[in-house]
Amino acid sequence: MKNPFIELCGCICLTLLTLAPQPAAAKTAGEVPPADTLRTVFFTDIHVTPGNAQDSLFRIAVAEANASDADLVIFGGDLTNMGSDRELAHVHGLMSQLRKPWFTVPGNHETTWSESGCTTFRRLFGHAGCVATRAKGYLFLGYASGPYMKMADGMIRGEDLAWLERQAAAARPGERIVSLCHYPLNGDLTNRQEVTETLKSVGVTASLYGHYHQLQLRNFDGIAGIPGRALAGKRGEAPGYTLLDFFADSVRIREKPLGMPPVTRYTVCLKDDPQILALPC
């Protein structure tokens, strides 16, 4: 299939902003050193159905990720359109072609319309929605946000919040904890305040999210909302994904159109960033 957006490569000149990591603070014995640079690919809302446009686009994205210098690939949910067993098996097969470590949480398209009650997701991905991953001084805690029935709002289950607290309590000294949830931690969740209070109590200062398909920073009650864009893009936008570069105390958010160089969109301090705190909750 011809990809017109690749033809734009010769017409677009992009200037990248380079951010140097800050020197690490003095460490106590046994402390995990802060990340020098943790380079991640952040896929969310890829919405793959066998044979659809996103199926082809995601194959290209996987090839790009494999050829990149990324240390880790993160999936923020909505891997499929209907959450069917066939779709889940297909997209899992494509994800398994990645030659980088990766992990995923489910999105509403996996939980709301699941034909297996989410048991197929558990069988394929090894968990029912909660997953912890360590990389270069960072601890990523991912969890499901529902909904768990049609027409319902999103919600973080009480047992998942308890899991978050247990995992955070087991963090190594010096580890920075980052939350991952498909839904933004706002009014789309029925228990938003309980979630953000729990996260803040365990030291989470940034939360990755998808669902809205666009790169827009958000303020989740003082927690930095770090977005991921949808694979297909909105009308007039090139297909693409998000690159997140984690430094000792900040994260750089870059948009990566397929077949084109990445563009820096934001750089965010991982604690008390003024541009985050100035946003409405």
Predicted feature locations:
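Bacterial N-terminal signal peptides that target proteins for export
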Residues: 1-10
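N-terminal active-site segment of His-dependent metallophosphoesterases
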Residues: 23-89
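Active-site-proximal beta-strand elements of phosphoester/diester hydrolases
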Residues: 37-50, 137-147, 178-181, 224-230, ...
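Active-site glycine-centered loops adjacent to acidic/histidine catalytic or metal-binding residues
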Residues: 45, 77-78, 107-108, 182, ...
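A short C-terminal boundary segment appended to hydrolase-like catalytic domains
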Residues: 27-29, 33-36, 245-281
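Bacterial N-terminal signal peptides
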Residues: 9-20
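Acidic-and-aromatic substrate-binding clefts and catalytic sites of carbohydrate-active enzymes
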Residues: 49-53, 79-86, 111-115, 185-189, ...
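Extended active-site neighborhood of metal-dependent phosphoesterases/phosphodiesterases
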Residues: 32, 85-176, 194-206, 218-228, ...
